């Protein structure tokens, strides 16, 4: 015989408890009920004056409802065990939702992916099902049996290895994400560090260049002032010594005792240009450096013209000139530089006066030619009447 469990409280008790706990805002707080004298009615009781239970049930149809749906349930041992199993299994996932076909397909795909490298290797070696003997077929059978066992294991433990694969994939994704973020941070920090290093290096080099330029400018200024304040006789002595050295070098080269053609040419050109630069910047200090370079360029152009004229003249006369163009250039530069240096040292301001004289002479010639041309035009514009009057007079 089964033991049935019935609830201790009926619907009447629930209704009374509900009425006891509720307070009607329109009627006010609940009055105290005295059960001995019965003078005080139960709180808000509407059905207490009704002596007929049917009338009470009419007011509250759920009070004496004898429908089967309201009968107490059967709380036997079987029902309790079933309810316990349902509640226990409701918190876990239903593993039977995955179809067997899906399990088999995913398990086969896993085995296929694992066997692809072996098949590719055997195909590459041209050893797949080719010249198989007894041992090879035994190995192949073992391989097939192993694949079958692995397939069964994967199919049986589908949820476990799928969960492991998911966890592994998530872990690898997180590792890749962390690695990418770390590399990005490293690249960012490295780029910022390199930018700072480049900036500091550029600032340092700029400061070095600035300091070097200022130092060289100070050195040039001191040397220029010293050369400008030196005695003219000392400058002439230095020039004469240099001239003697150049003549000795020329004589040695032409006599064949010294083979320094290129070195002599380059040194002569360089030192002569330096002498001309010193003359231009020291003896004529109001020339700017740009104008000095322009004068040097004009000197080189003039020398080039002289070289071309000499070579052209020798070519037209049919004579062979032993000197090359570089030697002619060096000789002309040497002569012109030393002549200009000597003229400026003997007569300070001679170059400026020569330049101004040449410019004024050219201007005077052009002005005279212009006046002559205008005078001829004025004589041609005389009217005929004036010419007749002049003839009569």
Curated annotation (Swiss-Prot):
Question: Which UniProt keywords are listed?
Answer: Cytoplasm, Endoplasmic reticulum, Membrane, Toxin, Transmembrane, Transmembrane helix, Vacuole
InterPro entries membership: WTF
**Residues that span the membrane, as ranges:** 104-124, 137-157, 167-187, 208-228, 233-253, 269-289, 296-316, 332-352
Per UniProt, the ranges with Basic and acidic residues bias are: 11-29
GO biological process: one example: meiotic drive
Does the keyword Protein biosynthesis belong to this entry?
Answer: no
Residue spans of biased composition, Polar residues class: 57-72, 89-98
Query: Which Pfam families would you find in this protein's record?
Result: WTF (PF03303)
Which region ranges are annotated with the description Disordered? 1-98
- Self-association or partners: how does it assemble? Homomer. Forms protein aggregates. The two isoforms can interact with each other and with themselves. High sequence similarity is required for their interaction.
What this protein is reported to do is described as:
Promotes unequal transmission of alleles from the parental zygote to progeny spores by acting as poison/antidote system where the poison and antidote proteins are produced from the same locus; the poison component is trans-acting and targets all spores within an ascus whereas the antidote component is spore-specific, leading to poisoning of all progeny that do not inherit the allele.
Family, per the entry?
A: Belongs to the WTF family.
Q: What is this protein called?
A: Meiotic driver wtf19
What is the organism of origin for this protein? Schizosaccharomyces pombe (strain 972 / ATCC 24843) (Fission yeast)
Write the gene name. wtf19
